[in-house]
Amino acid sequence: MSHATKNGFLTPYVELDRQAWAELRAATPLSLTEAELEKLRGTADPTSLDEVRDIYLPLSRLLNLYVKATRQRHAAVRDFLGESDRPTPFVIGVAGSVAVGKSTTARLLRTLLSQWPDHPHVELVSTDNFLYPNAVLEERGIMNRKGFPESYDRRALLRFVSEMKAGADKMEIPVYSHLAYDILPGETQIVHRPDILIVEGINVLQPPPPGRLALADFFDFSLYVDARVEHIRSWYLNRFLELRRTAFEDPRSYFHAMATSASEEEAKEFAMHTWHTINEVNLVENIIPTRPRATLVLFKGEDHRVRRVRLRKT
């Protein structure tokens, strides 16, 4: 079924306001506690239990339906081919700008999906783990392009997701530290074959070079967390200043000088310069254009609360 736009054109999307979306929760129970939510929230992220109930429980219910339908389709194909029953992970991509709250969204989904009655094994992987080390970025002269498409080891990321999708028992991937602002030498994250794999990052919906596979080609469902650019900018600044008062105090922090040597005004100027020259440019040029590729878009208001949801039905 398609819906008509205000201009009368048919569209494969349906857009729901917050109340209409919240009603789709049906009888899905809220089993998350405030203490558990506190551990899942990102720095300066105000996501509340009301937000979980109204937005993420309906999303959990929808994903449950998607997973069941996808498993049935995969089983039918295996039966047709006469292959043994070797389930492959249901892969979810979570995209959006820096500071928009996509990491909190991904962690919430991991927790909520793992609480389904059949208790699926859910793994969460950030594409930050596939950033090139700072030494490589410096050598290539693109340290100021960190977060842009060319700063990621795209081949390694594609190989990881494709092998997981193919049913690999386990894989080791690098580990990125936001404290060190770099890949940690010698440290790895071991990903055991999950029932559901969530891949979170600013670049997960980006199109491939001509003739190549896109990461999104391996997704069964994709989600884009959206907000107005000026709101994201404000959230980014608030988060940076909160980190200055907390994580940056750690001597191991890459930005330790922001907490010890810079005034608050200097820290604000640094954050805004970084936003305008790196994050906003990347958002406008590389991230926002991928939004139409998402299965579902969460539109946030200035207070971080989701105001409306757009779902692609085909």
UniProtKB/Swiss-Prot annotation:
GO terms for MF: ATP binding; pantothenate kinase activity
Pathway per the UniProt entry: Cofactor biosynthesis; coenzyme A biosynthesis; CoA from (R)-pantothenate: step 1/5
Gene Ontology, cellular component aspect: cytoplasm
Residues the record lists as binding ATP: G96, S97, V98, A99, V100, G101, K102, S103
InterPro entries: P-loop_NTPase, PanK, PRK/URK
Its EC number(s): 2.7.1.33
Keywords (A to Z) from UniProt: ATP-binding, Coenzyme A biosynthesis, Cytoplasm, Kinase, Nucleotide-binding, Transferase
Location in the cell: Cytoplasm
Top class in the EC scheme: transferase
Principal place of residence: cytoplasm
One Pfam family in the UniProt entry: PRK
Catalytic activity, as annotated: (R)-pantothenate + ATP = (R)-4'-phosphopantothenate + ADP + H(+)
Biological process according to GO: coenzyme A biosynthetic process
HAMAP family assigned: Pantothen_kinase_1
Family according to the record: Belongs to the prokaryotic pantothenate kinase family.
Protein name: Pantothenate kinase
Biological source species: Thermobifida fusca (strain YX)
